[in-house]
């Protein structure tokens, strides 16, 4: 005898076995392979391969894959705009080499432009892919012409769900990577980045990452050799994580500069497991003082932790008089709001440039300085470890010596 509950179950099983599933009935549910395009390279620096790449994007950019094969070189003599890529996968196993023309690139914003794109992977699966900014001519020209405007190598504005990974980026004329325009969910990982000059003119202003107005940006497993900030948290950066990064020759992991011409906010930043080699500072915060059209700078919920300091001039620095003279700041003190700033787990040895000083914390006299330091064991080569402080809280966590500047 079938009880009502068993009868209902039997009826359900009979119905499910009698009728085929929707997956079986619907051919539309079968996954289709991604379209794959390989742009045709012109094979000569005199031939601009950007039109061929744009043609490939038109054919395969909507959900497809664009492949630059290993052993190939594509010469890019104009801006490469990735417009038309949506949920696309760009696999660079060869070399994308931009021209060194200072005439063409002067005044351009970007060399490789990602504007309002949702869903894009720009990557090398093998680690052989190179994006070469060919910046030597720009380094030399900028040395004699400080008004020369140079482009950023990779410029991301707006959009979401963007990944840049596995690549080598080399010799940008200016900044390596810039993110702004309220971009969301960007990941940079497994990158090797180097800006080096073969003349006496250094690769100026080659920030590794300028992270502006954006949320949920992650930078991980990256090495940077350059001549400016390794990572700079610019106005509007929010929820940014930087981890397992090695920076050589840089100006540090930096918040700012902020407040130059209006109010600026940076918040919810975590930088941890960082190795800093021969940098002007390992980490720091740069804000403009009050007056002269400067705006209020607000820095909230920022943690710098587990830094290995190797030959950096300062292990940590706070500058509240950035961009102005000491005499100016005596009349127009810094007014930045620093709230929830945590510095912990710093170890290693400074360069000795400021021996015995290892850190310089100059908080603004008219601002807020909610900063804490712990497990801070960095020493100068002499074995001493002086921390200069002005306007810091009594609960800072380290012994202070007056005389901070900057």
UniProtKB/Swiss-Prot annotation:
Belongs to the glycosyl hydrolase 28 family. Its main location: secreted. PANTHER family: ENDO-XYLOGALACTURONAN HYDROLASE A-RELATED, PTHR31736. GO terms for molecular function: polygalacturonase activity. Pectinolytic enzyme involved in the degradation of xylogalacturonan (xga), a galacturonan backbone heavily substituted with xylose, and which is one important component of the hairy regions of pectin. Activity requires a galacturonic acid backbone substituted with xylose. The gene is xghA. This is Probable endo-xylogalacturonan hydrolase A. The active site is at residues 228, 251. GO terms for biological process: cell wall organization; pectin catabolic process. Residues 1-18 form the signal peptide. It holds the Pfam family Glyco_hydro_28. It is found in: Secreted. It is an enzyme of class 3 (hydrolase). The keyword Nucleus does not apply. One of its GO terms (cellular component) is extracellular region. PROSITE patterns: POLYGALACTURONASE.
